[in-house]
């Protein structure tokens, strides 16, 4: 049997594994508890499993826990962690921990090394695509960061397009929200996306986590200039798809709108944005652009962003301005990149 990584396996997958090893099905729940509740890092810790089973597991499996390789701490308390990919230690990806003064804490996790969506304003997009993360790589971020027990929210807003790696993201969402796993409410989790057609439809049909759609311009031609995927997944088609689903319950829909100075921050854009998303029960997160070396974009003035938000709210579209966090350590929105080698 080929070496298998236990972390990231769903209960069904663990059940198949223990049955292949000639063990009863209930051992799978015990194994899941050790992996996701007790967070074991070695098989020897799993003391309620028979020694014979532990021996079998050692011969065919590894746990798959991976420690943080590098930590950076921002002046505002944000922390950025570098992880190595389990099957390719030469490849790395980043995770961001964002504590709030009210006691909440959000973890921004990655789903790919780099990204193939190619957004022209994004440091991750400039990396190109270097591979999908495994379910073990993704759930390990949640389990292995220093403040894991303090987390109140997880957002798939790190490196990569989550719905381009849908199968893995779906497994992680199951583990995070199931009783055998972390037992989180889906409303504590948000998945961000540009809206790839197949992944978006599957997510809307199968998941109950919150959805955040990267919009950034209400005009297709202009959006295509900064987001080449507009040609593959037109925003109007994404809006049409979203309109088929109910967001009046616990699952929330939001639109991410990075505000660029002189590009998408005027009244014309605000009016078009209202018209585009008015049919949907949603909100808009306005995100100040974080300048990246070598890219031709700059941030909009705070007063301009505030006027933009005021207009949206006056038109009945709930809009908030996201506070920038971790900019001094390149941990803010759009700044994650591992092109530089480990120091």
How should each PLM-predicted stretch be described?
Residues 145-153, 158-320:
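Conserved AdoMet/S-adenosylmethionine-binding subsite of the radical SAM
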Residues 1-93, 243-252, 257-343:
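Auxiliary Fe-S-binding modules of radical SAM enzymes
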Residues 99-137:
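Canonical Radical SAM [4Fe-4S] cluster-binding loop centered on the CxxxCxxC motif
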Residues 79, 93, 105-109, 117, ...:
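Generic beta-strand structural signal
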Residues 74, 110-111, 192, 214:
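Short linear Ser/Thr-Pro motifs
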Residues 97-98, 168:
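Residue-level structural signal for beta-strand termini and adjacent loop
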Residues 136-148:
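Ferredoxin-type iron-sulfur electron-transfer modules in oxidoreductases and energy-metabolism complexes
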